[in-house]
Amino acid sequence: VTIYWIVQSGKEDDIIENLLSKYETLSGHIKVVKKNPDVFPTFTEQYTNETVQNNSLIVECGDRSRFIGYDDIYIQEADVYSYSYNTSFDGEGAITSAIDYVVSEELPQLYMLEGHGEAELPATFSEQIEKENIEVSSFSLLTVDSVPEEADCVLIYAPTSDISEEEQKMLANYVTDGGKLLVMAGPTEEGTLKNLYGLLEAYGVEASDGVVIEADREHYAFQAPYVLLPDMAGSDITDSLIEENYFPIMPISQGMKITGSSGNGTVTELLTTSDAAFSKIAGYSLSTYEKEEDDIDGPFSVALSVEANSGGKIVWFASSSFLEDMYNAYSSGANGDMAMNALSSLVGESEAMAIRSKSLNYNYLTISASTSSLLKVMMIGVFPLLYLGIGICVVLTRRKKQNETV
């Protein structure tokens, strides 16, 4: 593998230079070649039509290559809340992904289901999929007799209408035949997607009508009981998040309950609510966060995985919104990382090539509503009163000593 470093003499970025030297030192199969655009002005034209900035890279192996622009290494993203830009360094992730791409003969195939009002994938998640070197295609079950054989995984993302019974059978057969299914679907304004969630019934999982509301203040964020901070169970999908103390956020979620063993496979809960959670039957029409007579008691699973006895696999996230850029940012990227871990496990990439970019700004601190209230009381009330009390004691002590001296 050859990494061409496109840079003018004296304009080398120290961080990129240090990173490239580590790649070259740690592997005898990687060679770094510096190309000065002043000396070789047309060199990059055979690889890309883009404008090539200083400190851009080209990774090549045989007849495959990938261009890495400077703005793919130092990533700037607009922050609509602070009207500023967040900058992160993604050199390691971009280079490792490019090396994986140029040395791979076949890339995983992800097929996205369409035809049910599915939302467009958020830009951040799409970029992560591209970085993982997974090729994405769209398809409709209405125009095929079965799921394409070349599909390594089928993704159903944020549908707004239900699938038909015939489509349900096709997807069920796909999993029974060893297929892999990734679903991100929460409640809709019309209610529960009965046929879609019916795929889980064969494995002893039932969906509860309505929207999950969390009554335990340690388990929801931003003073919004429908924005859940669920508990994470250890698994290949969640272990990396648990180790680094990241917490996914699940907004507007469908509640799922394991009703018993079906004999068709093994179900593993990934994210669960507290025992105090309940599902509001009113769904999107709810007028109060208080529990009412017909509401359904928790706890619920809001993310789970299924390993079918046939070899098929399902990973199910019961929220259509958790990958939206806003919630992903509030979770400091934990939502996107968990989804990518799930996708990587399904397509057979046990060691995900997607490496977290290093933020040059800051991450959001996600805390529960009760912790937020406690901090407010401490900062606004307790600490000022404490310092006031100490000050009064000091003044009285000094006056007492002065009086005794007199």
Spans of features found by a protein language model:
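Short, surface-exposed patches at the edges or C-terminal ends of soluble domains, predominantly
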Residues: 1-406
